[in-house]
């Protein structure tokens, strides 16, 4: 089996190393599976936002299925979140946080977890003991369910989870209840 992992793009005319380096049609022709890395919209040096926003993932998939068979596509999504210090400043690094740690942190600081409908992602704000404000975006059962719905909507081969070593019990329960799994290493 030949597989590849490619950056997300939404058109043939996107410029930049991550976009022009990947010919979606060629990957679809020559590969048995293509992982589209639809994560890191929110990343270490970005402003606070969802790591894998469904609205952005949908744009990428709408383009991808015009270039390769959906049955070859594995939807890549994150299994982690980020904790940003506020106010965010250019060049300021966010801290990676596991989904379980994010949920525990929210509970420990009595933060209200909110859900962004467009991104289909969970987030909360809190103030740490030093008086600094934070914003945390992460994946929970609702966001995992929304991403799995994209697999059905586009008729994809399945998913590829980035950072499987970060346990996300709620996400795994949703995955196991909706799909059968095959481990490919």
Roles of regions detected by a PLM:
Residues 161, 166-185:
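C-terminal amphipathic alpha-helical "assembly" element
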Residues 51-58, 138-145, 166:
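Soluble non-cytosolic domains of exported or imported proteins
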Residues 15-25, 139-152:
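Short, acidic/polar
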Residues 145-161, 166-167:
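Conserved, well-ordered alpha-helix/loop/beta-strand core segments that scaffold catalytic motifs
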Residues 77-150, 177-185:
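Glycan-binding loop/region signatures in secreted carbohydrate-active enzymes
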Residues 1-108:
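Substrate-binding surface in catalytic domains of secreted glycosidases
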Residues 45-51, 133-137, 161:
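Second-shell loop/turn segments in exported
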Residues 66-70, 153, 181:
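Secondary-structure boundary motif
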């Amino acid at each position: 089996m030949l597989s590849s992992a490619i950056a997300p793009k939404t058109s043939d005319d996107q410029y930049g190393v991550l976009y022009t380096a990947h010919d979606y049609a060629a990957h679809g022709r020559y590969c048995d599976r293509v992982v589209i890395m639809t994560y890191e919209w929110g990343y270490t040096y970005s402003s606070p936002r969802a790591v894998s926003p469904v609205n952005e993932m949908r744009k990428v998939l709408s383009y991808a299925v015009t270039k390769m068979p959906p049955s070859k596509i594995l939807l890549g999504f994150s299994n982690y979140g980020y904790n940003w210090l506020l106010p965010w400043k250019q060049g300021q690094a966010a801290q990676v946080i596991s989904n379980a740690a994010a949920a525990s942190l929210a509970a420990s600081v009595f933060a209200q977890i909110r859900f962004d409908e467009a991104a289909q992602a969970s987030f909360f704000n809190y103030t740490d003991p030093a008086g600094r404000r934070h914003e945390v975006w992460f994946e929970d059962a609702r966001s995992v369910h929304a991403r799995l719905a994209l697999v059905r909507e586009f008729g994809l081969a399945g998913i590829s989870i980035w950072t499987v070593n970060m346990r996300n019990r709620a996400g795994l329960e949703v995955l196991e209840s909706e799909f059968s799994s095959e481990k490919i290493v």
